[in-house]
């Protein structure tokens, strides 16, 4: 049994990069044909598939100026939610699981197994883009998805974009500010990947197990960086929650004003 790290991180969501519509400096063009494209759908079309019926239900009885005409644009222009999210998974690094080596080929096999049940495990994360890249130093997986919730009982559409609620629907309730729904979900997915890796003779070498080998300065530096990342992630969640509440309050006030106008 060999030991390897397992990485799961939030990506920037560059669809053009994932689809290789351009080549970044770290991409080897002669290896692009090795990449595996599992899913490559048009984001706008998937939005129509997921939300058009909900938009129709929401607009019933609404004044024209209160109706939603394009949900994709509403999310794109708003600050409440992102159009989509991306996660990246990788086993090992360029030193021990490099592309073109037997170890790298094993990483590809494990990632391939892992991704095939991703959508089944995560029903409320609608995958529209999924790519396994082998034209960079280490094989890695990009998964682009739209998080959504159905049967929403509060203000707004009954089916809507919401990362927090999508993850709650999957059973990740969140805890303190360092134990958010996203953190819980990411850890769970890494555990799923680790279990598959174990079946192929790879044991998960979790970060922090070898900190005693770092000198004090490097250890503290690493811990500070980790803390900053956690705080940035928490800030993003709190901002999203605040904006969601603000939007609901604004919508309620607008409804009250409409009732007043109709009464007058």
Enumerate the predicted regions with their spans.
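N-terminal nicking endonuclease/strand-transfer module with a His-rich metal-binding environment
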Residues: 1-264
């Amino acid at each position: 049994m060999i030991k390897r790290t397992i990485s799961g991180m939030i990506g920037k969501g560059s669809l053009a990069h994932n689809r290789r519509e351009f080549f970044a400096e770290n991409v080897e063009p002669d290896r692009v044909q090795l990449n595996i494209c599992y899913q490559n759908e048009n984001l706008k079309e998937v939005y129509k598939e997921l939300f058009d019926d909900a938009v129709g239900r929401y607009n019933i009885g609404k004044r024209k100026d209160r109706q939603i005409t394009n949900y994709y644009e509403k999310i794109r222009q708003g600050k409440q939610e992102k159009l989509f999210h991306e996660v990246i998974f990788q086993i090992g690094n360029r030193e021990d699981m490099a592309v073109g080596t037997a170890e790298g080929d094993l990483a590809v096999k494990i990632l391939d197994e892992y991704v095939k049940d991703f959508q089944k495990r995560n029903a409320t994360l609608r995958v529209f883009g999924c790519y396994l890249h082998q034209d960079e130093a280490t094989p890695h997986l990009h998964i682009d998805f739209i998080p959504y919730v159905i049967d929403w009982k509060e203000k707004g559409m009954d089916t809507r974009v919401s990362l927090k609620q999508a993850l709650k629907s999957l059973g990740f309730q969140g805890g303190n500010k360092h134990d958010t729904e996203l953190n819980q979900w990411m850890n769970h997915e890494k555990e799923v990947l680790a279990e598959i890796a174990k079946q192929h003779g790879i044991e998960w070498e979790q970060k922090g197990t070898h900190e005693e080998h770092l000198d004090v300065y490097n250890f503290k530096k690493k811990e500070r960086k980790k803390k900053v990342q956690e705080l940035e992630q928490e800030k993003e969640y709190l901002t999203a929650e605040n904006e969601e509440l603000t939007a609901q309050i604004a919508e309620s006030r607008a409804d009250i004003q409409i009732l007043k106008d109709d009464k007058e």
